């Protein structure tokens, strides 16, 4: 089993990382750090540019999470996925036998999340795994 974390370096994602590390360590499970972003198109230069940006930006984000996981002594797998974050997380939850999916929130209103389809909101409705939504810290 594993703890699947959606990570993008936002304040909410950083808070979610701390919770996911705690859960993985307490349960003796592997942490799967997922960075997913949807491609703008499926052909040509636009798709190639997207893949390059995914590897660069997503790779940097994942490396930061991986460093924290290693410092905490948690076995970690990383996944860069060219798909909408919700789809990426559900796909990786299935692939890695998730016990829970952990995501951060960024303080949006529930109505805005429902209308715009935020990742946490959509996961709560689509996931067959438990979803832990961790709020971003309050601004100082």
Residues covered by each model-derived region:
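Small/aliphatic-rich secondary-structure junction motif
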Residues: 1-47, 52, 77
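A short acidic, glycine-rich active-site loop
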Residues: 49-61
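Short glycine/serine/threonine/alanine-rich loop segments
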Residues: 29-30, 74, 98, 129
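Glycine-rich, Arg-bearing micro-motifs that act as flexible, cationic patches
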Residues: 100-125, 139-140
């Amino acid at each position: 089993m594993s703890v699947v974390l959606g990570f993008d370096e936002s304040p909410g994602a950083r808070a979610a990382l701390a919770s996911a590390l705690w859960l993985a360590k307490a349960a003796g499970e592997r942490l799967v750090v997922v960075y997913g972003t949807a491609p703008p198109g499926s052909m040509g230069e636009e798709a190639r540019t997207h893949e390059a940006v995914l590897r660069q930006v997503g790779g940097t984000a994942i490396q930061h999470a991986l460093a924290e996981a290693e410092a905490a002594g948690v076995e970690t797998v990383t996944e860069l996925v060219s798909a909408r974050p919700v789809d990426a997380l559900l796909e990786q939850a299935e692939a890695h036998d998730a016990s829970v999916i952990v995501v951060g929130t960024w303080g949006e209103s529930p109505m805005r999340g429902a209308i715009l389809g935020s990742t946490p909101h959509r996961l709560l409705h689509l996931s067959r795994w438990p979803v832990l939504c961790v709020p971003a810290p309050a601004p100082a």
